[in-house]
Structure formats: C-alpha cells, structure tokens
Amino acid sequence: MVKIGLEIHGYINTEEKLFCSCKAIHGLKFAKSNTNICPICTAQPGAKPMLPNKVAVDKAIEIALILGCKINPKLIWQRKHYDWPDLPKGYQNTISGAHATPIGENGKFLDIKIKEAHIEEDPAAWNPKTGEIDYNRSGLPLIEIVTQPDFSSSQEVIDWIKQLIMTLSYIKALDKNAGIKADVNISLPELKGERVEIKNINSLTNIKNAIEYEIKRQKSGEVAKVQETRMFDEAKGITIKMRSKEQAEDYRFITEPDLPVIIFEKSRIEKLNSSLPETPQEKLKKLIKKYNIEKKSAEVLTKKLEIAEFFENIVDKVNPKLAVQWTTIELLRILNYAKKELDEVDIKEEHFIELLKLVENKKITELKAKEILNKFIPKSFSPTKEAEKHSKISSEDELESVCKQIIKENPNAVKDYKSGIKESLNFLIGKVMQKTSKRADFKTTREILERLLR
C-alpha cells in the first residue's frame, strides 16, 4: 500500500507583501528584477518588519475555514532558521514549528484529513546557474496546507488538488497568476522504508510524474533507510536525492521578538466564516438536484463562482434548458474569445434574460441572438431594439419564396445534393441565412429546402 501526503504552497491574493508595503507582484515577467523591494524585504541591517498584512491573515483564516479546520485564536510568529542564498535574514518568519500553533488544524476536505494550514513569508528567487537573486518575491505571503498521508495514488492526488484550487478560487484566496507548488511525501510501509519528501514540484503534470516515478523507484528496491529529501528532474523524469530530511530541531525555531502575538476575536472568525460562499461541491449537488441539470453541464457552471451565481440568478426567469445552454456555451464563448472573466465585464443579468426571452418567444433566431450577445462585451444593453431590426421571418410563405430563389441561383449545389452529397444542403441553408441576414429559423429552413428538393 502506498501512503502519500501533501504540503501545498500557494501565494495569498494580496496587494502588498506580508511585512512591508511593497507590491505583491509575482514573477520576473511582471517586473524587472529587484525593483519591487525595500529595506525590510531585503533584510537590511536595522530594518524591522511592519505589522502583518491583515488581508493576508484574514485570507489564511478563510482558507482554513473552508477546509473545515479548527481556528486557533492565538498565533505566535516563529523564526525558522536555515542557510540558503535566497534567505537574506538567515531565517523565515512563519506560524509553524515547535513553539507555534497553526492558523487552522484538524480539518477535512473531500475525505482527506487536513493536518494544518499556516501562513509564512516567501524567500527570494535564486537562480543557481547564474547566481542571481531577485528580491521581488521576498516577503510575499504564502499559505501552506498540510494533509495527512491519506492518498494512495497519483491520480487521486491530482483530482484532489484540482478540486482544492477550484474551491479556493471561490474565495479569491490565491493569486491566479502565481500557481501552486507542492512537497510530496511518499512511503510504502510494507517495504519498511522511511518516508521520502519530494520538494517544490511546480505543476500538476510534474506532481503526477514525480509520484509515479518515486513509487516505481522504491518498489524496485531503492528503499530509503533514513528519511530523505529529493527533487524532481522534469527533463529526465526522475527524482534525485538532495539531502537527508531535516527534523524540526534542525531549523532552531525561536519565537519572533519583533512581531506581536496575534489574538483573534471570536467575532472576527464568525464574520469571516459567515462571508464564505457555498463550495463548488455543494453548488454542484444543488444545481443537479434543484434544476435537474446534467452533471456535465453542472460541472461547467460550478467551475467559477461568478458563472454559477449568474446562472442561479437567471434560471428561474427563463426556460431552464435555454439558461443552461446559453450560460455554459454562449456566455463562456464570448468571455473566452475576449479573454475576460465575467467580473471583468459589465453583462447585466436582466439584459441576458431579455435576450433569452426573445429567443424563447421566437422573436429572433438563435444565430441573430448570438450576434447580439457578441456585442455584450464590454457592456451589455437592452437587446429588444436591436432585435426589432432583425425580427425573425414569421411567414413560412415568405421563407419558402427565399428558399426557391436560392435553389434557382445554385443549380450545382442542387445537383450535388440530388446525387447524394448531403453536405450541399448546408451550403444552401447558409445561402438562405445570408439572404435573410440570419432572420430565418434554421430548423424551418432545413425542412422547407428538403421538401422542395425531393
């Protein structure tokens, strides 16, 4: 049996760093090296930390709460000592270690027990090949989520992490530009070896590959005699030993004298807890049960909170089937094309409902409605006046007259259709749509053409 535990590291979504007022900007692609720094985050002599970023602490509490953790009301900052080029102070400020209680502990998320969730500061970015150290990252607030070793396969790990990321996106807890990293702990108790930790794996693909390689390596007889730390070589697809695993005493944890103890009032925790939305998993079950939606469509709706809430606000006011179709397909289509999130544009629910009612009442064709919807970005409008210019052809006699004209103008397509090339019918339908400025009903047009071509 394989036992796998995770330590997930994510950047908390804040505007400023944890102990200074420098902007929280992630990655060299967003800023030049060492331009977003100050004496505090570069550990200049005499520089003292500011009070911890309240937004970061509150976000950490929300993360712990949504993972079902018990919140500890008293938090004591620690100094975690180790020697590495990216750590200018020689220690990391964290709420973990021998003398600390984490922000949250003893939680559970999707049947996986959460040991703890705690907050800490990120070190700088060090490039061992060039020796360059970029302090833009130094001091960014990190959340670390530690699970019990409850996983038994790589796929189980990946599925769980995907659900975790989606859930935390509902509370906008993590910086979406920064991604996550994971330390993976693997042991095979039947082989009587020690636990192996694989550090700093930076993508779901690499996490999966690292786990599968490490299980295979240990089963082949390379069992660790002592706990050890390894790294994953992405290019070679293997894990490489870095060092023996450190124990807590190796980090020489001491209480941080420059930072005050954090005391959480009960009312503060209750307020944060009451502000939490339903989780994606809860919404999924609700949408399927309440609106009889297929699971696949419900999964699309619940990937993002703003889409799920948008749907819930319109579904009782229009045909539910139409609401599902136009939210999961057409709304997402225009957002993806514009490379925008729903909360980055101004699409009013009443305008969307109005458009769907025009379709439902056969005032306009779906093709014309899609054209109008395309114009809803960046800002929606009442579609009724626009629809009046392009009202649907209601007379079958009028539509039949257009179809006869198209048949007359396209003898080659007619000949192809009658010789068995059925795709030619779509060509003729397209010509009708073009002639009528998409005011013709697609289904009716097809039926009339098929009848006329018999």
Range-by-range predicted roles:
Residues 39-43, 141-149, 191-195, 309-314, ...:
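Short, hydrophobic beta-strand segments
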Residues 292, 314-323, 363, 419-423:
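Structural motif
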Residues 1-278, 289-291, 295, 317-320, ...:
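Basic, nucleic-acid-interacting segments
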Residues 13, 216, 308, 328-336, ...:
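Amphipathic alpha-helical core segments of compact helical bundles
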Residues 180-190, 289-312, 320-338, 376-378:
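Core structural elements
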Residues 343-353, 366-434:
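Strongly charged, low-complexity linkers/loops
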Residues 269-275, 312-318, 352-364:
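Extended, non-catalytic structural segments that build the interaction scaffolds
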